[in-house]
């Protein structure tokens, strides 16, 4: 029996795929690196048990257990393919490894709608780009709240919206306040002017620009602690206007130009961004720079910075990257963050970028 091992190391536990050939049939195992000197090779069933324990997975029946096990094995194969297509990142087992692609899209993504601007949106003015720094990160400047978790609710758009307004409010007032996604989930039903019937609809998806339009019309957002997140929709709107703490003065869409995106990021704070999340289901860390990735947008995230030292296997050189704040909790990715290559609009990351300004009072 021949074992072909490919080991990927990270600071914490990571997962490495091992392809084993037995009588001409290929099976997929995973090596879990617990100790670099004493690695233990586990069968996929044993690893599924560890996966359930690590992420607190409980299934209601033996049938559900075996169904999820089959999905888990399929996702191991998918993660292997992602590793080959995206070698500068690390792909493997995540909390989403027992979900089908359709379940993942429905429960953890949620951007929908077209690209026509709401009536109160503008095209962002062209900014000078001659002296942009090589690296920039709003996390080091106090404009980014801790990573949040949308749960099994397609409300990513609301987290992207609040993240951008949290940063803008910080720039306007010097105060970092965590804002309420649940207010958007419950109260925002603004519609995309390009696509009839495509409206912000809680856990069933929405669009950041529509949410900015709602926030502008409503007067602003409450604190998260005053209107806490539940990860469910269908409830009544509990907006208390006397508790609004952050308001939008204007918002605009940035052109598909990475220097302009960087300039707007530096001047205006974290930016609301849409992306294709195909590679994010299996992402563990590193700089994601896939050879091929659709630009069909399906996930709302927050652009908080960029770096200059991510190695790209495709380009065989250091490649600059965007730093993305996600809304799947700190156990996903690099403590809740995602790095993706700059330079080619990979996964559509440059296609729909919005900046918002907050009022000073």
From Swiss-Prot:
One of its GO terms (molecular function) is cysteine-type peptidase activity. This is Probable cysteine protease RD19B. GO terms for biological process: proteolysis. The active site is at residues 156, 299, 326. Its main location: other. GO terms for cellular component: lytic vacuole. It is found in: Lytic vacuole. Glycans are attached at residue 250.
